[in-house]
Amino acid sequence: MQRVTITLDDDLLETLDSLSQRRGYNNRSEAIRDILRGALAQEATQEHGTYGFAVLSYVYEHEKRDLASRIVSTQHHHHELSVATLHVHINHDDCLEIAVLKGDMGDVQHFADDVIAQRGVRHGHLQCLPKED
């Protein structure tokens, strides 16, 4: 491990210290390493041909005009990406789905875009994790 020195303005340093405290880091170096790893992992998932894993989460209105069947159709169209799906009934109208995906990150992003773009889908979020060798 090597030691490096960086210069931060006061506001950014205060934000880093606040983040470090909220997340329970023992020191700034641990926080900066995690932030950098996250940025590098996100960058790696943008490269075409990168294989990895992802978690897609979203909320949708299950009774909204054929929405559930459209989502299922999209899932079947991209069946090779699906590892597992968790379905949770939030309340009478809304459902939360969490899909674990694996495959080419470009294909995963395309699938996520297809689901999130459906009318009635809210709070869509894709978290990508490149496969580590």
Curated annotation (Swiss-Prot):
Pfam family, one: RHH_1
UniProt GO molecular function: DNA-binding transcription factor activity; nickel cation binding; sequence-specific DNA binding
Domain of life: Bacteria
Note on how the cofactor is bound: Binds 1 nickel ion per subunit.
A biological-process GO annotation: response to nickel cation
Binding site for Ni(2+): 76, 87, 89, 95
Cofactors: Ni(2+)
Coiled-coil intervals, chain numbering: none
InterPro entries: Acetolactate_synth/TF_NikR_C, ACT-like_dom_sf, Arc_rbn_hlx_hlx, CopG, CopG/NikR_regulator, Ni_resp_reg_NikR, Nickel_NikR_proteobac, Ribbon_hlx_hlx
Keywords attached to this entry: DNA-binding, Metal-binding, Nickel, Repressor, Transcription, Transcription regulation
HAMAP family tied to this protein: NikR (MF_00476)
Family, per entry: Belongs to the transcriptional regulatory CopG/NikR family.
Oligomer and partners: Homotetramer.
Function of the protein: Transcriptional repressor of the nikABCDE operon. Is active in the presence of excessive concentrations of intracellular nickel.
Protein name: Nickel-responsive regulator
Source organism of this protein record: Salmonella arizonae (strain ATCC BAA-731 / CDC346-86 / RSK2980)
Gene transcribed to yield this protein: nikR
